[in-house]
UniProtKB/Swiss-Prot annotation:
Subunit structure: Part of the 30S ribosomal subunit.
Zinc finger C4-type: from-to: 17-39
GO CC terms in record: ribonucleoprotein complex; ribosome
HAMAP family (UniProt xref): Ribosomal_eS27
Provenance organism: Methanoregula boonei (strain DSM 21154 / JCM 14090 / 6A8)
Name of the protein this chain belongs to: Small ribosomal subunit protein eS27
Length: 62
């Protein structure tokens, strides 16, 4: 029972870049800086746990 509750703490997120409106998939607990592939803006920065997102979340994949 504990394993089921702890299994889904992270997910993939589809985010939208605020500068160029490019949609990109990022991991919710990214350990490196994620940049937009089109314009190069930082979309997510690592914090030691969940990433600090600087983009709009469109959808979540669990």
């Amino acid at each position: 029972m504990v394993r089921e509750a702890r299994a889904n703490r992270s997910s993939f997120l589809k985010v939208k870049c605020p500068d160029c409106d490019n949609e990109q998939t990022v991991f919710s607990k990214a350990s490196t800086t994620v940049k937009c592939v089109v314009c190069g803006r930082d979309l997510a920065t690592p914090t030691g746990g969940k990433a600090n997102l600087k983009a709009e979340i469109i959808s979540e994949f669990k």
